[in-house]
């Protein structure tokens, strides 16, 4: 299930990041399911592979799988923009073409959600910017600051019983909401200052991974 911040971020352009096996696909599937149950939208997902099958509820959902329905994320995104979806889920932003098309889609009014293999919000911004040639990077910073609304960087922790046995896993998330201060840091290339902004941004729904880990330990115990 989604918490309040997660539900709010469903109506915005967001990225979910973390290492392999950190639950990124599950988080995005929860967001898609929330939208599907509550809003009348056209949702298009591009995945490798399709891990969660979504039946149309209030929304109409179309799912595309790499290798079966399309050759690449970039090709699928190009086709997607011709199908007039309201929401596009990009399973993984792997290369310049995919990232560029995703930013363009967000700038043209589509809600775009996607994943990257990064471990923090600041690393996510750096990874996106660094994909582009030096001469394009400032323009991409501006575009990203205008279109990005949130980054969720997550990890999964083992949940232990009182006798030390594993009882599943619990998720901890760093949450960066792109308010005016964060947007300025993106535009100015000051990603090193993002952690401090996240620390002081609790009133906007932000939290550091350390705070999330502390809350997870309380929840586990």
What label would you give each PLM region?
Residues 1, 7-8, 12-217, 221:
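Short, flexible helix-loop junctions that flank or precede catalytic/ligand sites
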